[in-house]
Amino acid sequence: MGALAKRFRAGDWSSHLGLERARHLGSHMAEYLPCPYADFNGADLLYFANFQAIVDRAEWHWQRFDEPPVIAGRDLFFHGNVNLGEALELSFSAVEFGQGGLAHWCEVRRGSDGEKIADVVTRKRWRVR
């Protein structure tokens, strides 16, 4: 997993969780301002669990599905953190919508300097009722 994280950080990957980077190019952008009361821990670091929650919120604001999909797989690669008061820029750089569900790769960057602090690859399946 460590080698894969290095490849993501360097932008040197082609396929992960069935998402093909070159074939599923995306361009949706979102901004998120983490809440100092809910998103950070006592050391003023963004909670690791909140990275995926932030990506899910951005996806929900972008694509409000009648039936929200359920998570089938997700990998997060952490490269840094953000300071209190700094906004995050989320770039959905690869996106796939299909019969079985959706997948996306989200690059999370600090708004202040554009430094990538996380890569989040998510695969979701459509809900069956």
Go through each PLM region and give its residues.
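Short, well-structured alpha-helical interface segments that form or flank functional binding sites
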Residues: 46, 50, 83, 87
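HotDog/MaoC-like acyl-thioester-processing domains
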Residues: 1-5, 82-84, 94-129
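Non-catalytic linker/capping segments at the edges of enzyme domains
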Residues: 1-43
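Short structured motifs
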Residues: 73-78
